[in-house]
């Protein structure tokens, strides 16, 4: 650990600087699928990953250094940096090793598993660093904007990093999932969306009943514009979709139960509409949980605005995302990762519609990856300009003082 701390304090290592000059190579779900299904070759995957993984790590490691020093000096952020440095150096050992050696391929597989496990707690640990920073230095709008920009890119990079590793380890690790034998790595070529909806609902329902002893029911409706009367299927990563749906169901259930806690005749159902068109697959989750004021919608996706109580990371440093208020922003990153999105439409006093948009075609579902370049650098260095729209004063003017003299 001392070595990594020393390295972190040095100027950008030449290898990190060199790899960060390359842009990541985004893949589509179709490319993931075609490679895993038709011509899965461990040598080819190895040769791609031994370059691509360091590129993605180096891009985000360069960007970390643009954060405010007061944030970089938080122990939790330093710990995350040490993990990234260690993983980068371990992957770099395979830069020139021959793919023709079976032992090299096996060792590389084991390194990928070790790296993935090392990064398991990146999200809560980085969140801990943000909390430490906010508690000590307070809230600054400009710095908050930069932290929001960085964390969206940092966590997206992590999602992509794990996607690449999972595909390689699942395809070449020798462990076929008996529950999902038709999956290509972590991708389901015929993902039944309604089934994932119901699985996510049941999991959220179980938690809701544990805490509140009750839970709203679920109503699901499908509309398949491409093939009427057929169940909606999509080529997708079920674990990503489950993550998004579980978070939205959890929020809808909590809002509904808390609003109608004194009601004796039951609760309004949470309604889900799944639609498939030519371009988009959309999933709308609607509740009657009272809604959210318009001014608070953006805050729900802001890492610095979290009002959740500070969770403990001991003894394993692991913590649920919801404990940091990161559930919604991370879910939106999962949706955006393959060119989709997650949006909230709320009517205060009534309820909220949450809509997940996914690409209907796997050939259009390309990874959306952050790139470290001059545009990114300028985002951190440009000072905020004065607002060019009027802002209401905290103390409105007395209009009577400005009456025209007769």
UniProtKB/Swiss-Prot annotation:
GO cellular component terms listed in the entry, alphabetical order: mitochondrial matrix; mitochondrion; nucleolus
Binding site for ATP: 247-254, 287, 306-307, 323-328
Induction remarks: Up-regulated in response to hypoxia. Up-regulated in response to fatty acids. Up-regulated by PPARD.
Any Pfam family the entry gives: HATPase_c
Family: Belongs to the PDK/BCKDK protein kinase family.
Disease entry from the Swiss-Prot or TrEMBL record: Charcot-Marie-Tooth disease, X-linked dominant, 6: A form of Charcot-Marie-Tooth disease, a disorder of the peripheral nervous system, characterized by progressive weakness and atrophy, initially of the peroneal muscles and later of the distal muscles of the arms.
PANTHER family attached to this UniProt entry: [PYRUVATE DEHYDROGENASE (ACETYL-TRANSFERRING)] KINASE ISOZYME 3, MITOCHONDRIAL (PTHR11947:SF21), PYRUVATE DEHYDROGENASE KINASE (PTHR11947)
Protein name as annotated: [Pyruvate dehydrogenase (acetyl-transferring)] kinase isozyme 3, mitochondrial
Organism: Homo sapiens
Gene responsible for this protein: PDK3
């Amino acid at each position: 650990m001392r070595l990594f701390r020393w390295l972190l304090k040095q100027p950008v290592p030449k290898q990190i600087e060199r790899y960060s000059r390359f842009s990541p190579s985004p893949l589509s779900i179709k490319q993931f699928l075609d490679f895993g299904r038709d011509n899965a070759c461990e040598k080819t995957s190895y040769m791609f990953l031994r370059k691509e993984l360091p590129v993605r790590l180096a891009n985000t490691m360069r960007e970390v250094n643009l954060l405010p020093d007061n944030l970089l000096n938080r122990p939790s952020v330093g710990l995350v940096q040490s993990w990234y440095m260690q993983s980068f150096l371990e992957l770099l050992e395979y830069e020139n090793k021959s793919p023709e050696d079976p032992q090299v391929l096996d060792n590389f597989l084991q390194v990928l598993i070790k790296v993935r496990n090392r990064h398991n707690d990146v999200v809560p640990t980085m969140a801990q660093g943000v909390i430490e920073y906010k508690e000590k230095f307070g809230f600054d709008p400009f710095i908050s904007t930069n932290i929001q920009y960085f964390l969206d890119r940092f966590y997206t990079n992590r999602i992509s990093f794990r996607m690449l590793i999972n595909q390689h380890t699942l395809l070449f690790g020798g462990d076929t999932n008996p529950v999902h034998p038709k999956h290509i790595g972590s991708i389901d070529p015929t993902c039944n969306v309604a089934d994932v909806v119901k699985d996510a609902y049941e999991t959220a329902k179980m938690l809701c009943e544990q805490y509140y002893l009750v839970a709203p029911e679920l109503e699901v409706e499908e509309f398949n514009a491409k093939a009427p009367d057929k169940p909606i299927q999509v080529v997708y990563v079920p674990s990503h979709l489950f993550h998004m749906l579980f978070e939205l169901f959890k929020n809808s259930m909590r809002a509904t139960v808390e609003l109608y806690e004194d009601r004796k005749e039951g609760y309004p159902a949470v309604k889900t509409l799944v639609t498939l068109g030519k371009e988009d697959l959309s999933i709308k989750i609607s509740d009657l949980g009272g809604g959210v004021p318009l001014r608070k919608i953006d805050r729900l996706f802001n890492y610095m605005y979290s009002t959740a109580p500070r969770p403990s990371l001991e003894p394993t440093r692991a913590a649920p995302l919801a404990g940091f208020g990161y559930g919604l922003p991370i879910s939106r990153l999962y949706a955006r990762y393959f060119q989709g999105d997650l949006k909230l439409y709320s009517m205060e006093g009534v309820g909220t519609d949450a809509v997940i948009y996914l690409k209907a075609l796997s050939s259009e579902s390309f990874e959306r990856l952050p790139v470290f370049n001059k545009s990114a650098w300028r985002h951190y260095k440009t000072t905020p300009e004065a607002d060019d729209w009027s802002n209401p004063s905290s103390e409105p003017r007395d209009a009577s003082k400005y009456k025209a003299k007769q």
